[in-house]
Amino acid sequence: MKLTGRDHLTLLGATAASTLLPSGARANGAVHEVKMLNHHPDDKKELMVFYPDIVRVSPGDTVRFLAADNNHNSQARNDMLPEGAEAWKSKIGSDFDLTLDVEGAYGYFCTPHKSYGMVGLILVGDVSGNYETLKTVRQRSKSKPRFEDIFARGDWLLAGEA
């Protein structure tokens, strides 16, 4: 998927909003929604997607996976987690809340649709400990170009924070 100006503004706005919150508001943990969809809302040709497929959060925030379409779930990639983080696997067709306290980058996928490239990335706090390593993890089938695109947008997002 090509990154549009609208995508850049969305990423920038989400990042700015999370950093401008008073520390007390962040301490309670914000909720970030990720929809599990059969079709990308802006490109119906793009099938089996998490939307958004990259999320920037603070430690203690919750990522809420919404089963907007049936037959999807969220599962951690064990080889794409920060040290000390716990893996997860949600039930297919169910909403799922994931609260993240360990800083770093988290790769995940939809169990039935991994081969379709239904993958995503969560960036929690300081990701310098494992972000670059995650880029080198071997990807297969349609997951490879999707993760390449996600990491390109992640690079842009992180560069904007520097």
Residue ranges of model-derived segments:
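C-terminal segment of N-terminal export signals and the immediately downstream linker at the start
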Residues: P22-H40, G84-E86, I92
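Extracytoplasmic/periplasmic copper-protein system
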Residues: N28-D42, Y116-A162
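Histidine- and aromatic-enriched segments that form or immediately flank copper-ligand environments
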Residues: L66-K91, G120
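Beta-strand-rich extracellular modules
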Residues: T111-H113
